[in-house]
Design a protein with these regions (language model features):
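Alpha-helical transmembrane segments in multipass membrane proteins, preferentially the mid-helix core
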Residues: 6-11, 73-77, 135-156
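Hydrophobic alpha-helical transmembrane segments of multi-pass membrane proteins
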Residues: 1-79, 96-113, 164-179
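A cytosolic-side transmembrane-helix exit/cap motif
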Residues: 44-48, 75, 79, 182-187, ...
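Short regulatory alpha-helical coupling segments
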Residues: 216-233
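Membrane-interfacial segments
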Residues: 17, 79-86, 118, 153-160, ...
């Protein structure tokens, strides 16, 4: 909770929320903050009353909502569509938005259907017949992110390429581990490390050249400089 608040306040103080990817990151941090507060409240005040089943239900919803990028998909698809100031191909919308919506509906209705997870007579959490759908869908998003990163690699700096690849590899490895043995604590750790990677990617505290010279885009800066030199010649 403290780290989430510090990061959010830091971004607002520095007014570093202009780019689309930074706004997506801030939205993810807000979701992290809210889900963590909910978890603390449930564990601290209601765990003796709601039982293990509802506690696990909360954990699954909060962490998988983070893992499947709820803020980016829904906020940008819905708000920008409503305001009609963002070009988003319908084919892309269907390919990304519809599968995610189906999985989210399965998750929300699972107490009634038992498809994603079920509750044993001892009020213990057990995986349902469609639990694997989370891993399949998330794997699709991770592969898509890799392909996008490769196709757009010319616009990324070396630091950004390394951090993005580390982020995706970490999430992919964590999913494999989780598919073998469920551990909600490990999911929380995974989310924290993922947020650290995103912070390094966006805030860039390690790159001395960019930090000192306040150059956000080395390639763009180089292109402009070369054009000016040609004009002078």
């Amino acid at each position: 909770i403290v780290i989430s608040i510090v990061v959010i306040v830091n971004f607002f103080i520095r007014k570093s929320i202009k780019s689309r990817i930074t706004r997506s990151f801030i939205e993810m941090m807000f979701i992290t903050l809210v889900s963590t507060i909910l978890e603390v409240v449930i564990n601290g005040f209601f765990s003796n009353h709601i039982g293990n089943s509802m506690l696990m239900y909360h954990l699954v919803i909060s962490y998988y909502a983070l893992l499947l990028t709820l803020p980016t998909l829904y906020i940008y698809c819905l708000i920008y569509f409503a305001w009609k100031n963002y070009t988003f191909p319908m084919k892309t919308f269907v390919r990304i938005f519809v599968p995610y919506t189906i999985v989210l509906l399965l998750l929300i209705t699972t107490p009634f259907t038992g498809l994603v997870f079920t509750i044993s007579p001892k009020l213990e959490y057990t995986r349902g017949p469609l639990f694997f759908i989370f891993y399949i869908e998330t794997a699709i998003y991770i592969i898509a992110a890799f392909l996008i990163t490769l196709s757009e690699r010319s616009s990324y700096s070396d630091r950004e390429k390394v951090l993005i690849c580390f982020f995706l590899i970490f999430v992919g490895t964590a999913l494999i581990i989780q598919s073998l043995k469920w551990n909600s604590g490990f999911i929380g750790f995974m989310v924290s490390i993922s947020m650290l990677f995103m912070t390094l990617l966006l805030d860039n505290p390690l790159d001395y050249f960019e930090k000192v010279n306040k150059i956000k885009n080395k390639k763009g800066f180089q292109t402009v400089t070369e054009n000016l030199l040609r004009k002078k010649r």
